[in-house]
Amino acid sequence: MSELLFRLNFLLLLLLSCVSLASSFFSFNDPVVGLGACGPHQIQAFTQFKNEFDTHACNHSDSLNGVWCDNSTGAVMKLRLRACLSGTLKSNSSLFQFHQLRHLYLSYNNFTPSSIPSEFGMLNKLEVLFMSTGGFLGQVPSSFSNLSMLSALLLHHNELTGSLSFVRNLRKLTILDVSHNHFSGTLNPNSSLFELHNLAYLDLGSNNFTSSSLPYEFGNLNKLELLDVSSNSFFGQVPPTISNLTQLTELYLPLNDFTGSLPLVQNLTKLSILHLSDNHFSGTIPSSLFTMPFLSYLDLGGNNLSGSIEVPNSSLSSRLENLNLGENHFEGKIIEPISKLINLKELHLSFLNTSYPINLKLFSSLKYLLLLDLSGGWISQASLSLDSYIPSTLEALLLKHCNISVFPNILKTLPNLEFIALSTNKISGKIPEWLWSLPRLSSVFIEENLFTGFEGSSEILVNSSVRILNLLSNNLEGALPHLPLSVNYFSARNNRYGGDIPLSICSRRSLVFLDLSYNNFTGPIPPCPSNFLILNLRKNNLEGSIPDTYYADAPLRSLDVGYNRLTGKLPRSLLNCSALQFLSVDHNGIKDTFPFSLKALPKLQVLILHSNNFYGPLSPPNQGSLGFPELRILEIAGNKFTGSLPPDFFENWKASSLTMNEDQGLYMVYNKVVYGTYYFTSLEAIDLQYKGLSMEQNRVLSSSATIDFSGNRLEGEIPESIGLLKALIALNLSNNAFTGHIPLSLANLKKIESLDLSSNQLSGTIPNGIGTLSFLAYMNVSHNQLNGEIPQGTQITGQPKSSFEGNAGLCGLPLQESCFGTNAPPAQHPKEEEEEEEEEEQVLNWKGVGIGYGVGVLLGLAIAQLIASYKPEWLVFLFQSRNH
């Protein structure tokens, strides 16, 4: 069973135990579900509480949601409203009138991002509090220390910051999960955390904790059964006191910077999961690890382990089912000893850099093997032939980056195969016809090879069972074959396909992700764009207009039709796509006015209209300011927009006004199908005038924002309200007709890296505040009517003089015109200037400008259906693996 399933089952058992122990009061006054047993004041308070929120998302048939009251006193004892509420949880909420409340479940609600009200401290009889995935941010209020009766506290998957000082006095806690937040700081030996001696489940994973070593005091929490400190910044050696935790069944330390030998865990005889991947552990693997009595999951991948692998003969009785030794530096023969672990179901040996070819026959003893990952290895070509042998039980085989040049016929012998990854090899010719007849084949990743086509007719894929098919970056040409009837996810990005996109695409009702970008397709866009969550047709030769067929609540999240030959207007029915987040129609011939109506789309974050024939004003007539609630990237360069921008133009751009610390932002990559540490990614791309160069960018930190209005006919003053957009990293207003002064408020853009105001009619001086912008790497104010001395500051004086030329009244470095009547010395040696410009180019790609979202959100329904048919033993693990 995979790590994730282990954890879910373990947490469920603990919660049941917690509820049982924490709810002894039920024994004399059993709570009654529904409002019938509730007192009138409690009914009124509950009604008021629900009225504070939008409850349309509530599943009223969910028997687990509801309110429970004490049959004797009428007091609300338990309240469970999971995935039910939308709105703001305010400090004066009626919730805080339930002073007898013992159990409160508010996870997975759509709360407006805000801090946790300190009034929770008034509910001092709480024993169970679940507030995970609720959008909470900021520090946990100190009033939480009043909740001394708490036995279970779940705050995971929020945006919480600060330290764990709020756990002071919570000495009855048995379950504490604060994972996937932004808690930070050093865990000192005197931390309140180490006073929680009843803890059985402690998850600190995916935060920003740090320490020169894991505190020895963890060894004092000797009731722990699960400990997770993964994805933090711990470094140094794991203390020997970890061996005191003799009740541990699961230990997770991956994705830190631990060094030294592997931790001493031989005493932890109850251990079933040991996850130590992606650290800097060195030395050899103790052979005793392979004979621990209950250990079923061992992940040591991505370390600096070396030496030989020794598996005792007694390991034949080992319970080890999941083993990851990939990305280490072992020596000698490693497959032979591993073949003794006959109960293995999942084996990951990727990127071991063996000095000899791996013969697949060596795995013949592993009769229960479901998943085998040999990516990055040197595979014996002979062992890939039909005459070789590999366990027929295999459901997943990964042979990426293996320098394979011939399609492995051994796949014919695997009737249970569901997942095959042959990515980034050198396989040429046609994809064999027999592959599509494998009865259970569901996911095929053969991107980045040299395939030219398919054996068989254009109908060869239609009746296959494949749901995910990735053909990215091959040499496929001709007409696109008809896709499988069952397909959910298809990418043929970056090939040579041509002709019309077949209309049969529209009949594939389960197809939610389609990427045909970077090909040579001609003709119209198929008339069914509403069918998709993600549709990417970028850089083809498509003609006609974008179909205006988006029905109400169409599921579309991302539409990219940039770099085609499209004409007509932007579809008005796009307003029906309430889930739309990314829209790019750049580099076409669309002739239309600015789509003011799109500001009604609540989730739109990226809007790219670059290089079309859009025209008219940017100020919405009689509609107030141009406010987009979530917009972060607006790229309208190279059009014919006219008019001026009113002073309040940027006032209601809420998302661009917010700023986060960089470690709080998430790189969000569009179109990602996650198979644990294995990803298939198709990035949304945009072209941006960024730091003086035109380039294609693929990613953006989701907490950043960019604006490009260059190459239009805009006039008037630049609004001072631009200074409200504190998340801006790039602003390009060049090649317009702006007049007046450079706004003083630009000094408020503390995150700005690229500022281009060139080729306008700006006058006055350059504000001194711009010289204080410490992240400003590129600045261009050339060809205006500026005067006075150029502000001095590292970020400005380091710019090339071309950034200030064409302003007759400017003086001072880096120009040679002195402000004191004599020529200024050269700003820098020409060679140094060239080196600086070269260095500037090298840093351009440190942070891309584009946006995307994991398909864990975008393709949840489609992939959930897919997962439901898979055996979780290997598939769920794949959701935990590393990206190669």
Swiss-Prot record:
Q: Signal peptide: which range, if any?
A: 1-24
Q: Which domain of life is it from?
A: Eukaryota
What InterPro entries is this protein classified in? Leu-rich_rpt, Leu-rich_rpt_typical-subtyp, LRR_dom_sf, RLP23-like
- Which residues point to the Cytoplasmic side? 869-884
Task: Please indicate if the UniProt record lists Repeat as a keyword.
Answer: yes
List all membrane-crossing ranges.
Answer: 848-868
* The keyword Lyase belongs to this UniProt entry's keyword annotation: no
Which keywords does the record carry?
Cell membrane, Glycoprotein, Leucine-rich repeat, Membrane, Receptor, Repeat, Signal, Transmembrane, Transmembrane helix
Location within or outside the cell: Cell membrane
Q: What positions does the record give for glycosylation?
A: 59, 71, 92, 146, 190, 208, 244, 267, 304, 313, 353, 403, 463, 520, 576, 732, 780
Extracellular topology: which positions?
A: 25-847
User: Where are LRR repeat segments found?
Assistant: 98-122, 124-146, 147-170, 171-196, 197-223, 225-245, 246-268, 269-292, 294-318, 320-344, 345-365, 366-391, 392-413, 414-438, 440-463, 464-487, 488-507, 508-529, 530-553, 554-577, 579-601, 602-625, 628-652, 702-725, 726-749, 750-773, 775-798
State the PANTHER family in the record.
Answer: LEUCINE-RICH REPEAT RECEPTOR PROTEIN KINASE EMS1-LIKE-RELATED, RECEPTOR LIKE PROTEIN 30-LIKE
Q: State the protein's name.
A: Receptor-like protein 39
Q: Which organism is it from?
A: Arabidopsis thaliana (Mouse-ear cress)
